[in-house]
Amino acid sequence: MSRYRGPRLRIIRRLRNLPGLTNKLVESKKNQASGNDQSNQKKVSQYCIRLEAKQRLRFNYGLTERQLLNYVRIARCAKGSTGQILLQLLEMRLDNILFRLGVVPTIPSARQLINHRHILVNNRIVDIPSFHCKPKDIITIGAPKTYQSIITKRIEAFAKDQIPDHLTLSLSEQKKPKGFVNYLINRESIGLKINELLVVEYYSRKA
């Protein structure tokens, strides 16, 4: 299954707000239907609940089905809670790190910066959005000056308290942004509201 490139509002109406996909907020179809007669509403199966959780995770981080399945398999082989390790793997992706730093408004826009070879990790160009960042990694932006100014304005308007504790963002005297990974993210700092155990249960027979 390929990465979704269709209308984003259609997705968030169905799956609720996904900050990584779009910063637009809409009322979900479930909330719109809350005023309807309860007798007309079908009981949602456990499978559908797990499927929705999986879809929320996949669309928020911009993954293909195969990519997400691979992450689940890696998480299963690691020591610790499979669900928390899965979220940690996704949150430590380079495209998501740029998004959480406030450098870009969404993960797709972060992926565009990376694909255009504008991002450096430890002074080396990285053009792989799924690149796994580690503690003590330093992330800088080598975009053209016109793009740098746009990024700088966004960072200056971005509330610093929105940056999670495992990351630090600073601006040099030349107004160039620099991100620093302090440590691996913990569960409390995950940006997406989701029950990761439902995702693990969904893949229990596939991974």
Curated annotation (Swiss-Prot):
Q: Which GO terms describe its molecular function?
A: rRNA binding; structural constituent of ribosome
Gene Ontology, cellular component aspect: chloroplast; small ribosomal subunit
Q: Which residues cross the membrane?
A: none
> Short name of one Pfam family for this protein?
Ribosomal_S4
**This protein's name:** Small ribosomal subunit protein uS4c
Concerning its family, UniProt says: Belongs to the universal ribosomal protein uS4 family.
PROSITE patterns associated with the record? RIBOSOMAL_S4 (PS00632), S4 (PS50889)
Name a biological process GO annotation: translation
Query: CDD domains per the record?
Result: S4
Q: What does this protein do?
A: One of the primary rRNA binding proteins, it binds directly to 16S rRNA where it nucleates assembly of the body of the 30S subunit.
Q: How does it assemble?
A: Part of the 30S ribosomal subunit. Contacts protein S5. The interaction surface between S4 and S5 is involved in control of translational fidelity.
Give residue ranges for domain S4 RNA-binding.
92-156
Which source organism does the UniProt entry give? Equisetum fluviatile
Q: Where in the cell is it found?
A: Plastid, Chloroplast
| Primary location | plastid
Q: Which UniProt keywords apply?
A: Chloroplast, Plastid, Ribonucleoprotein, Ribosomal protein, RNA-binding, rRNA-binding
